[in-house]
UniProtKB/Swiss-Prot annotation:
Keyword Iron-sulfur: no
Source organism of this protein record: Salmonella paratyphi B (strain ATCC BAA-1250 / SPB7)
Signal sequence, renumbered to the chain: none
UniProt entry keywords in alphabetical sequence: Cell inner membrane, Cell membrane, Membrane, Transmembrane, Transmembrane helix
Main location per the UniProt record: membrane
InterPro entries named in the record: DUF986 (IPR009328)
Membrane topology: Multi-pass membrane protein
Domain of life: Bacteria
Family the UniProt entry places it in: Belongs to the UPF0266 family.
Name of the featured protein: UPF0266 membrane protein YobD
GO cellular component: plasma membrane
Phylogenetic lineage: Bacteria, Pseudomonadati, Pseudomonadota, Gammaproteobacteria, Enterobacterales
C-alpha cells in the first residue's frame, strides 16, 4: 500500500464520518428535533469540479496501468463526493434552545435581527455573522416563523 492509498483512505474515512455525523448523530444532539427543514443546495459547480478531477485521476490511473487498489479507492472517493454533494440534502434542524445550520449549533439568544428578502431568503443577523437561509419550499418559512415565535 502506497502513501497515496493511505491518503485516499483518510479522505474517504473523513467523508464517511461527516456523512454519518450529518445524517445520524447531529439530529440527536441537543434534545429532540422540533422542526427539520430542507435547504437548497449550494456550490454545485464545486462538486462537479471535484468529481470531475477524481474521474480524471481514475482515467489516468487506469490508462497508466496503476494499482487496482488506487483505482478502487478513487472510485470510492468519487462516490462519497457524489453522495455528499448531490444526494444528501442540507437541512436546518431546530431544537428547543437553538438550531443546527451548516453543522454549527446556534442558540436562539444569539439572533439579533431577522429579515426576509424579496426572493425568499431568510436572513438572520448574529453578533458577528449573517446567516442566509435558502429553504427549498417557500412555505417552510412560515413554519420557521411560527417555531421561533413559540420558542422566544
Amino acid at each position: 500500500m502506497t502513501i497515496t492509498d493511505l491518503v485516499l483512505i483518510l479522505f474517504i474515512a473523513a467523508l464517511l464520518a461527516y456523512a454519518l455525523y450529518d445524517q445520524f448523530i447531529m439530529p440527536r444532539r441537543n434534545g429532540p428535533t422540533l422542526l427539520s427543514i430542507a435547504l437548497l443546495h449550494r456550490g454545485r459547480v464545486d462538486s462537479v469540479i471535484f468529481v470531475g478531477l477524481v474521474a480524471i485521476l481514475i482515467y489516468n490511473n487506469v490508462t497508466s496501468h496503476g494499482a487496482q487498489m488506487t483505482t478502487w479507492l478513487l472510485s470510492a472517493l468519487a462516490l462519497m463526493g457524489f453522495y455528499i454533494f448531490w444526494i444528501r440534502t442540507p437541512r436546518i434542524i431546530f431544537k428547543q434552545r437553538g438550531f443546527f445550520f451548516a453543522n454549527v449549533w446556534i442558540e436562539y439568544n444569539r439572533i439579533k435581527e431577522m429579515n426576509l428578502s424579496e426572493d425568499g431568503v431568510l436572513v438572520m443577523q448574529l453578533e458577528q455573522r449573517r446567516l442566509l437561509i435558502r429553504v427549498r419550499n417557500i412555505d417552510d418559512l412560515e413554519k420557521i416563523y411560527k417555531l421561533l415565535i413559540e420558542n422566544q
